[in-house]
Amino acid sequence: MVLSSQLSVGMFISTKDGLYKVVAVSKVTGNKGESFIKASLKAADSDVIVERNFKIGQEIKEAQFESRNLEYLYIEDENFLFLDLGNYEKIYISKEIMKDNFLFLKAGVTVSAMVYDDVVFSIELPHFLELMVSKTDFPGDSLLITGGTKKALLETGVEITVPPFVEIGDIIKIDTRTCEYIQRV
């Protein structure tokens, strides 16, 4: 439990209405001199933002997330199947929770999942992954001389920009945060 005056941006709290992330917090003094804490809260399972007022000194339950390592197995009926490497249970994760992370997934990739009450709320990919190039544009002679770039389609279906010397079948290292080519492996 934390006191309302200890709320800070980025903190997760649990209320009777659900799980929320604090996105803004301020102390407000009312007309009669009574102060309260005004917080903007984003629902953890959607993009809905609500405003809540808390009395000064009110106790609020802070949500304690658990980080788990999950190994991606395959996709099944619009859900992604993972294996929890801690207890070897299978976990299904929806496309909504995956967001754009699924663009880089291939079997065997280990991700970090933020879990609360045995429910996965977010997935974080490794910052760097090694993926195979399955298709590239043909670089013209002028592109090779000037050191330009070309498009490459990776084995997971994502398209990125690569240097002209990258060919089909090459394994390349990419930054999953920026979707940029790092190096040929």
Swiss-Prot record:
The domain of life for this entry's organism is: Bacteria
Question: Among the entry's GO cellular component annotations, what is one?
Answer: cytoplasm
* Localization per Swiss-Prot or TrEMBL: Cytoplasm
Q: Which UniProt keywords apply?
A: Cytoplasm, Elongation factor, Protein biosynthesis
GO molecular function terms attached to this record? translation elongation factor activity
Which BP terms in the Gene Ontology apply to this protein? peptide biosynthetic process
Please classify the protein's predominant subcellular localization into one broad category.
cytoplasm
The reply to whether DNA-binding figures as a keyword in the UniProt entry is no
Q: Matching Gene3D superfamilies, A to Z? A: 2.30.30.30, Nucleic acid-binding proteins
A Pfam family it matches:
EFP
* The family this protein is said to belong to: Belongs to the elongation factor P family.
* Protein name per UniProt: Elongation factor P 1
Which organism does this record belong to? Chlamydia caviae (strain ATCC VR-813 / DSM 19441 / 03DC25 / GPIC) (Chlamydophila caviae)
